[in-house]
Amino acid sequence: MFNYNTRWAITEYMEIYRAAWKWNRSLPKDARKFRILNISYHYNWQKFSGVRTPENMHEVFPLGNTEDFRCGLLEREVLASGQKILVLTGTPHAFTFYHFPYYDYTSPGYVRYEQNFLGNLLYSKYGSKVVAIALHQPFPNRLNRQPALLSPALGRLEAIMGRMDNKPIGFDLKGTPLGKLDDDSYYSMGYNDFTLADLFDGYIFLKPISGLSSCSIDYKFMDTKNVDTAENVHLFYKSLSYYLSQVPAYDCLLYTSPSPRD
């Protein structure tokens, strides 16, 4: 878990490692093994001065920004040899053809569109070979609007799923009626006639948002034996007592910011 800038010990992450290890041990000696690829690296937050500047960010991220690094790693480890990979990442990092909007005074219409997230970089090189599939989730609302989170497609997607008894299902968005559902979330800022198909290629509905829960946190992962290692890896590990005080708050946390970084 310390091979990335992991802030918290997520039980499900460790269960994935355990399942892959168990599966690989069951295979014949020469069989191709199930592989888990860590697409990031240790950041050096000890070099952070409290204010983000080009100079200290070069120190914090010595191998480059996360998007470029991840793109290069996937190319070297997977795409260069013609293999395929399923990448699980935060939603903005997964955008491919869609360009995430920011308010920007100097841009036309006061909106600047990000084209350098991981998915964007891969899509610019490999086109339709790279697809973005969303897991059902709340969308961030427009700036200065409440509530902070919205049900996708103005709630119509969940209404349709409700008529189907909320059974888990995956479906295409491109060229389908569900993909034509209008959306007025933050993602639509700067776009005209914005629909779900303008965001992703496909969608996986697991259950209504009201029934979703966050990952499980291993409260015993951090102890006096490894807290020093954690402090060196991540800025937010200030002490064992601080970590333990923050876990309950994080356990209830929902994504509310439309512009995550790092």
What are these regions (language model features)?
Residues 1-110, 118:
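A substrate-binding/cap region within the structured catalytic cores of diverse enzymes
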Residues 56-71, 99-104, 108-254:
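Extracellular hydrolytic enzyme modules, especially secreted metalloproteases
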Residues 255-262:
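Conserved small/polar residues in nucleotide/adenosyl-binding loops
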